[in-house]
Amino acid sequence: MNARHTLCTVLTLLTVGCSQQSAPKLEPLKLGDGRTIAAETLERGRDVYLYYCRSCHGDKGNGLGPSAVGMRPVPRNFQQGLFKFGGVAVGELPTDAALGRTLRRGLHGTPMLAWDVPPADVEAVVQYLKTFNPRWREEKPGTPVEVSADPWKGREAEAVERGKAVYHVAGAGHAGCSGCHIAYVSRPELEALTLQVTGRKVDFSKGDLYTALARDSDYAVEVDEKGEPTRTAKVLPPDFLQHRLRTVWPLGDEVEDADYTPERQREDLYRVIAAGVGGAAMPTWKGAIPEENLWALTYYVQTLVNLRDTREGRALKERLLSPAK
């Protein structure tokens, strides 16, 4: 248990007792998907929330708990009803499975830790989170984005080459991720890829292809007395050679009591690329580009992710940033 984990637990233990003693009875919650969550489940979820979550996310689920000061990224404000990693298309409510996965795994590279909580408590607190925003009473969760069969098995090198083009070129069934994230090829390479995919000659000699710009998001960092956002967070698209991805772990780590294999890593990458990132500039790519291109993109991004903190990755970064790129 690290120092922040210990501090959060201590703060919770110092404050949770009084809140539990005075906590009012809860009414059953009728959800937009037709289910009704029993009051007993919600009250159990509240107990779990107060014990594990309150110190960061606050009594009211607004992300303003006593431990939240100075945290980056800031704790999620559940009152907004927005979730980045919901396992569904952008803009839809997340599935219970996706919320539970985040609770069990945490978010890599953030103060959101993996919590070793019994499954019944995970289920209960997932339902309790739905009391913070009326969307849950009015809408159904989105359709889960399923991980399809990998069409590139046994052809990994070919997939990476295809994925490089899918990443860097926009149009013709390609995603053009380098428009928000940075490019990882030289300017001449990018011009050649663009000509190959689109048949168009484009001059990339001007402009900064290797610095990402922070993008607007829907996530509040300041609210007024009514809880309405007055300022929202800027989100920097990750540089895969430098930044940790929230729902993807380094190979060899143990995630949910199992070794994190290349296959598991690839599935997690596919899931977030396919679904997109809710409330941010990252769109849903499932259905927007051909499935074989979506998987090829996954393979290519995986190679970049695994170059992070390596000599080869640093050398690539230096080549891209050199004057003769």
Predicted regions located by residue number:
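Short pre-active-site segment immediately N-terminal to redox-active cysteine/selenocysteine motifs
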Residues: 49-55, 60, 74, 111, ...
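Bacterial N-terminal signal peptides that target proteins for export
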Residues: 1-7
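Detector for the c-type heme attachment site
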Residues: 19, 56-63, 104-105, 113-117, ...
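Sequence/structural segment immediately N-terminal to covalent heme-attachment motifs in c-type
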Residues: 38-58, 153-183, 190-205, 269, ...
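Short, solvent-exposed loop/turn and secondary-structure capping segments
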Residues: 58, 65-69, 90, 112-115, ...
